[in-house]
Amino acid sequence: MQKSKRDKKKFPNTVPNDKKGENQMRKKLLTMLLGVMMSFSLAGCGNDIIIDVVSNEGSGVETESSEEVKEETKDDAKEAVKDDSQDESGDEANVNPAGMKAIALEDLKIGVLYIGSASDTSGYTYAHELGIQGMVSNLGLKENQVVRKENIDDGDDAAVKKALEECIAEGCNVLFTTSWGYMDETEAFANEYPDVYFAHGTGYKSNGKNFTNYFGRIYQARYLSGIVAGLKTKSNKIGYVSAMGSDNSECTGGIDAFAMGVELVNPNAKVLVAVTNSWFSPDDEQAASDALIAQGCDVLSQHVDTTAPQTASQANGTWAIGYNSDMSKETPDATLTSVIWNWSAYYTSYVNSVVNATYDGSNYYGGMSESLIGLTDLSSLCEDGTSEKVLEMQQKILKGEFNVFDGVITTNDGTTVGEEGKTLDDATITGGINWYYKNVEVVEWK
């Protein structure tokens, strides 16, 4: 199977967001995105409690309050782009801090590039498609205002270029490119079309004007899912199927955060990592999962795009942690919870900033406090006390009382990173984690 560019490149040691942009995004989300927020009931583990994480199932729960907020969002967006006759400053009122013109809600044409199909029912593209659907609902857009380009191989520059050309030809003035390997072509098109807004998912390139990148603090949810796994395991061997090895900070940081969560509740447990060297390889993901289970792992987690670790776990009578979307639908007898993205939070905020002239060209790196990431409902398969411990640590993260990568951290080769009283900065987390936590072991599986 051909490897995509996501396989070949790693994050450089650069900061993926600036604080001004992050703070502006945060304020928008708090005031305008109640319509995409949802309370999850952690019904398993003996207690019914509410944990304030997000659902990525479209636009979330429709309540009277969320509908009111949604209508206010639509009204604000429409009001933001005023007719010149209503403002003495004329066109200047419609120019945002990045020096670009705002786009009226009804004039938006949004293009999206997917590595998979918009009809996928789980996984990476599915999560992004739910986010786009949520954005459309939240802003009251029409379906014909969205152009989807599906199954675009991010290792095929010609295919990426063709998809972008088609979006431009169809009149798209906002484009989201959702996979790592789309980065270079997105940059080139942003330079060629300076009046079009481009946002690239993951990656690191941007120009501070019409080309930005977006990702999130998924490690926060990884940490919480480690608590779930650490309490569940009976063998004290927990498997982790990872797309990339230690040269990719996104994967390695997620593994480390997960392993720290495991250790918090079960210091005797080990996390065994099998690396597939591909983001999307169903056969390898299946084989790696089977190998980890054969080595005694009774809980699997994953940073790969398919449900293979979940299906392998269900077939073998073991348990698993899903990723990207709620995978319990496919494997209800195995999936304990899933680490998910609520991309509608980001997409809604971004497009709204384009409409209301507050877009400033900054990159985005949100987390739980922005309702970008979270966990799905904990299954009744979870151990007693899981929901209480997850909620406790989630609240500490949200209140700023705890950061995952705090203080001196011991790696699995006995060295240490970090400093007492300090937290690893964003540049290190996104581009500089090339070490594994002390309870992690990378294993051979083929």
Predicted regions and their residues:
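Bacterial N-terminal signal peptides that target proteins for export
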Residues: 23-32
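A residue-level marker of the well-folded mature domains of exported/periplasmic proteins
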Residues: 48, 52-71, 75-446
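C-terminal motif of bacterial Sec signal peptides marking the signal peptidase cleavage site
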Residues: 41-44
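Hydrophobic helical h-region of N-terminal Sec-dependent signal peptides
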Residues: 34-38
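Short, Lys/Arg-enriched N-terminal segments with co-localized hydrophobic residues
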Residues: 3-24
